[in-house]
């Protein structure tokens, strides 16, 4: 049995959110970044036939460089991607709220 694209998006999203340095999933800058199936959608992950597009907001200060964070995300979602190439889009940086 194969997973539906919404299941793939959700599983990938959970793996991404469990990654140190990821604040949240992004929504897309100029077009909505989401996967649709039936009447449901999952925002932050776009499942295409040959590609998985992950949109994130990273934490600042950074625990690792952006390229290292993207590599770690690709490793974490590899099992969920169904062999698709994974593209990581860093949409924004969320600065930690520090008390003065």
Features from the language model and the residues they span:
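A generic secondary-structure micro-motif detector
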Residues: 2-3, 63
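Alpha-helical assembly-interface signal, strongest on the long, hydrophobic N-terminal helix that forms
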Residues: 4-12
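Short acidic amphipathic segments
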Residues: 12-26
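Short edge beta-strands and adjacent turn/loop segments
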Residues: 25-55, 87-97
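A short interface-forming secondary-structure element
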Residues: 50-68
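Short, non-transmembrane amphipathic alpha-helical segments
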Residues: 63-84
